[in-house]
Amino acid sequence: MAAAAARSGAHPPSFASSLGRCRVLPVVVVRRPGGAARPSPLLAPARCAAAVGTAAPKVEGGGRRSSEQGQLAVAPARLVDELVEEALVWSSQHGLVVGDKNHPRSGKAPGVGLLHAPFALLPMSFSKVYWDQAVELAPLFNELVDRVSLDGDFLQETLARTKEVDSFTGRLLDIHAKMMKLNKKEDVRLGLTRSDYMVDGATDQLLQVELNTISTSSNGLACGVCELHRNLIRQHERELGLDPESVVGNTAIAQHAEALAGAWAEFNNQSSVVLVVVQPEERDGLPVAVVYFRAGYTPNDYPSEAEWRARLLIECSSAIKCPSIAHHLVGTKKIQQELAKENVLERFLDNKADIEKVRKCFAGLWSLENDSIVMSAIESPELFVLKPQREGGGNNIYGDNLRETLISLKKDGSNELAAYILMQRIFPPASLCYLVRDGTCIRENAVSEFGIFGAYLRNKDRVIINDQCGYLMRTKAASLNEGGVVAGYAFLNSVFLT
């Protein structure tokens, strides 16, 4: 253990330290209520094998076998336990930790009730072709989000039917409509986004899962796991036969901090603060330059009218919102589906080559007004995902539940069909991976989802920032539908370019 600690490497930058390097800013935090796969050449050690055995598991549901993408399972069996121990020590020393929900004092006493974030033991090999494609798309999606957000009529018309059956989206649209009536202009616009993708095993295409425009979380943990993997490979370069520099560095935390600092600078008031909306607390007397919504994307974040009044007050203010109500609405699933329709991208993007690049990554997306697609989904539910207008994970509907939901909605002639969209289910390549949670290593047939963070800052006609800024790689068992790290399904991972 001491040896592992001695080799643990440098501490990855925290959000606070990165923000500090950009500019010294006062920050106010407001709290909200509530607080395949080929069989690997290595054999799992006893601690891993006891959990899942040593035979390569069967691919179920989520993935298809591919040699193009997979975890770099090249360590001798005797090394795996040593790597696990070193990784756990490094995580505790360098802040790659999360709150332990099972600990009674977690979140109540500083430094108490923490455990390592779940992580893959080795990085995921990932084709440079897909990486370059996602990086190239990032500024295009940043620009697209901003342009769509400026078309208030498009947002209102596209989401009009959804509003009738989805009260949460309806409340957001009401605030947006009030801003339109007031002719409220957002001269300075800040967007921190994440576009999530999977590689479709059937077509070898990188397809977009969703575009997130609010509370694009896990950038700090994503940076940490990259440093963890680089450190492990650096310490065992000879045994692993890998180059630590092939693990793609992750600058998400620093670049997002720079974007927030840049927005603060554009506000041009040295006494102003950055307001981070998380949970209940109130501060008065300070001008607010930037409001960052870490919360506010689910109905649970608005338990009373007080929260809705606060959201309206923020939108009416001169503060730079991240996201503004319009940027927030652009991230809804219905808008994603509408943008995939023929000739809609042309409404917002001018360059034909850029339009084709964006369109190429769209998976199949349909409204439930399309009866033939609905019938196809009822007959073959395993090929589709039913998505409501919700963020935060755990909301999508799959398999038999999808079929039953559609049959029920069709039978009732329910207007609630407008609350959902159908999406082509993506089947990414599966590979055998070592995954570590709660100090225990297991061997699983797994698939990955890859997200690219983006930052966009504009003041009227002047684009100040339009960048790709880091990434998030999440790996989960191929048999699972959901993929949230915090929810307990997925594991943090990094990219090893091949």
Where on the chain are the PLM-derived regions?
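Preference for protein termini
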Residues: A2-T498
